[in-house]
Amino acid sequence: MTMAVAYFDSRKYHVVVLDSPGHKDFVPNIISGATQADAAQADVAILLIDASVGAFEAGMDGSKGQTKEHAQLIRSFGVDQIIVAVNKMDIVEYSKDRFDLIKQRLGTFLRSCGFKDSLVSWIPLSAMENQNLVAAPSDVRFSSW
């Protein structure tokens, strides 16, 4: 399994998108692909989090948590700024409590990796229901907070 790489330019930035599987067996591919795609010179990274109950916890598991490992890899590449995209909020009924729990637990870990709170952005979203993905959320359960 390889990592998908795509490039595009905005008015201000040259963007390199690396999409890699989250499974631990593919971590060497992440490292190899990131160095080949100049990700080690990135200004910002997006860390995609699964908000569903059990999935987030598995990613934070001390012995095999891929969320933790990916955050550490991002930081080891010298990336200071990170966007944490908390996806699948629809599965947890757009629970602000769930989002806040994820933000608190992961935020603590990100700080321990050297990320500064001022350079971490948190975005709750639901890709399946197109909520807060491209435009502001329309679902009242989500937009109310």
Regions found by a protein language model. Give the residues of each.
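Eukaryotic intrinsically disordered and solvent-exposed regulatory patches
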Residues: 4, 27, 108
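A generic secondary-structure signal
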Residues: 33, 73, 108-112
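Alpha-helical hydrophobic packing sites
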Residues: 1-2, 21, 89, 128
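Switch I (effector-binding) loop of TRAFAC-class P-loop GTPase G-domains
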Residues: 1-12
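Canonical P-loop GTPase G-domain recognition
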Residues: 80-83, 91-145
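Conserved Switch II/interswitch segment of TRAFAC-class P-loop GTPases
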Residues: 12-16, 20-27, 36-100
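Active-site-proximal loop/helix segments of hydrolase catalytic cores
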Residues: 30
